[in-house]
C-alpha cells in the first residue's frame, strides 16, 4: 500500500513540475512592497514563450528587480504579465513610444500627423539626428486621439502595473554636450531651426488664435516665453488626458522623462512636474551631458524640489557605459538624494561585467535589512 501511495505522490509531483509557470502560480503570494523599487527597461523578445520569459527573469529577480518596463505590442506584453505570475511581487509596465512613432504603421500612413520644424520640414520626411526620430504633432487632433487610443490599448491589459509613456515630448532642440561633441559632431550654441520642432500648421493656427500672431512672425521665436509655454502645454495636456483615461481603467501611469525640470523644459519642452503621473522616471544619464556622478544627486534633488513626492520618483540610470562600482555608486546617490527607486537601462546590459551584482548589493542594503 505504501508503494502505491509513493507512486501516486511521484505522479502528482511530476505533473506539477511540467505545468507552465503561469499555471503553477495562479495565486500570488502577498508580498511587501520594496522600500526602494528596482526595475529595468528593455524590449520584449517577440518570439519568447511564457516559460522562456520566466527563465529570462530569474537572474534579475534574484538580484532584486521587481519592475519590468517592457517595450512591445499589447499581445507581447500580455505574455510578460503571465510570466510575472511566477515571481511574487513582480510588476510589468507597458513601455510605449508616444509622440515619436518610427515603426508605427498606423501613424506612418498619415504624413499630415507629423510635426514640422522651424524651417518647414516635416518629420515624416526629414530625420533630425537619427532615422528613428519620427515625431507626431500633439497639436493635430487626429494624432492626439491616436496616441490616447494607443495608451488605452495597453491600459486594457489585465494585471498591468502601469502604462509607461516614453518619447512624450518634442524633438531635442538641444542635445547633451557629449552627444553633440562625440556622437553627432555638431555645435548647438543656439536653438538651430532644423532641430526646433512644434511648428505644425495646426499648432501655428492654434497659437495665432490665442495670441493674434504666429511664432514665425517673431525674430527669435525660441526666446518667446509664450511660444515656450504653448508647447509645454500641448504635451502636458496630452499626458493629463491620457492619465485621466488610464486611471479610469484602473491602471497607473508612468513616464520616462528628461533629467530635471529646467533641462526638460528648455531642451525638449517637457514640463513633467505638472503631469498626473503615479511614477516618474527621470533618465539621469550623466554621461550624455559630460557630467560626473555627483550630477545625479543634483538632478534628483531638483526634480523632487518641484514634485514633493506627489508621485514616486524612480531614478533612471544608463548601464552600458559605466563600471559596476560606479553603477552601485550612482544608484546609492539616487536613493540617498531622495529617489523612491532606481531603473536600469537596459536589462541586457546588467548581465555584463558584474553589474547585476551591483544591483544585488543595493537590494541587500535597502530592501533586505
Regions found by a protein language model. Give the residues of each.
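Substrate-binding cleft/loops of secretory-pathway carbohydrate-active enzymes
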Residues: 173, 252-290, 322-325
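Catalytic domains of carbohydrate-active enzymes, especially glycoside hydrolases
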Residues: 50-76, 157-162, 274-280, 337-341
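The substrate-binding groove and active-site-proximal loops of carbohydrate-active enzymes
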Residues: 41-46, 65-71, 129-145, 223-234, ...
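Substrate-binding cleft of secreted/luminal carbohydrate-active enzymes
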Residues: 277, 282-295, 303, 309-369
Amino acid at each position: 500500500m505504501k508503494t502505491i501511495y509513493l507512486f501516486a505522490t511521484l505522479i502528482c509531483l511530476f505533473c506539477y513540475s511540467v505545468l507552465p509557470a503561469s499555471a503553477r502560480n495562479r495565486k500570488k503570494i502577498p508580498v511587501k512592497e520594496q522600500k526602494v523599487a528596482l526595475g529595468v527597461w528593455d524590449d520584449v523578445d517577440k518570439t519568447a514563450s511564457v516559460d522562456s520569459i520566466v527563465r529570462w527573469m530569474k537572474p534579475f529577480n534574484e538580484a532584486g528587480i521587481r519592475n519590468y518596463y517592457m517595450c512591445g505590442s499589447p499581445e507581447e506584453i500580455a505574455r510578460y504579465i503571465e510570466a510575472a505570475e511566477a515571481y511574487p511581487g513582480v510588476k510589468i509596465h507597458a513601455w510605449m513610444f508616444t509622440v515619436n512613432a518610427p515603426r508605427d504603421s498606423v501613424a506612418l500612413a498619415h504624413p499630415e500627423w507629423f510635426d514640422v520644424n522651424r524651417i518647414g520640414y516635416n518629420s515624416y520626411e526629414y530625420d533630425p539626428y537619427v532615422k528613428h526620430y519620427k515625431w507626431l504633432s500633439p497639436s493635430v487632433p487626429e494624432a492626439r486621439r491616436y496616441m490616447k487610443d494607443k495608451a488605452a490599448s495597453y491600459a486594457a491589459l489585465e494585471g498591468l502595473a502601469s502604462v509607461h509613456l516614453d518619447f512624450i515630448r518634442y524633438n531635442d532642440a538641444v542635445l547633451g554636450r557629449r552627444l553633440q561633441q562625440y556622437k553627432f559632431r555638431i555645435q548647438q550654441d543656439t536653438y538651430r531651426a532644423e532641430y526646433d520642432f512644434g511648428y505644425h500648421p495646426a499648432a501655428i493656427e492654434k497659437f495665432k488664435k490665442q495670441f493674434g500672431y504666429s511664432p514665425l512672425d517673431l525674430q527669435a521665436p525660441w526666446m518667446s516665453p509664450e511660444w515656450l509655454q504653448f508647447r509645454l502645454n500641448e504635451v502636458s495636456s496630452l499626458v493629463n488626458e491620457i492619465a485621466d483615461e488610464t486611471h479610469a481603467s484602473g491602471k497607473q501611469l508612468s513616464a520616462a522623462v528628461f533629467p530635471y525640470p529646467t533641462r526638460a523644459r528648455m531642451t525638449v519642452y517637457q514640463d513633467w512636474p505638472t503631469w498626473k503621473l503615479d511614477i516618474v522616471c527621470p533618465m539621469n544619464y550623466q554621461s550624455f551631458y559630460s557630467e560626473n556622478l555627483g550630477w545625479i544627486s543634483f538632478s534628483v534633488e531638483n526634480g523632487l524640489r518641484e514634485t514633493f513626492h506627489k508621485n514616486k520618483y524612480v531614478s533612471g540610470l544608463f548601464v552600458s557605459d559605466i563600471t559596476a562600482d560606479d553603477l552601485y555608486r550612482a544608484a546609492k546617490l539616487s536613493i540617498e538624494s531622495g529617489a523612491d527607486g532606481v531603473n536600469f537601462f537596459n536589462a541586457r546590459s546588467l548581465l555584463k561585467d558584474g553589474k547585476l551584482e551591483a544591483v544585488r548589493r543595493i537590494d541587500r542594503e535597502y530592501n533586505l535589512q
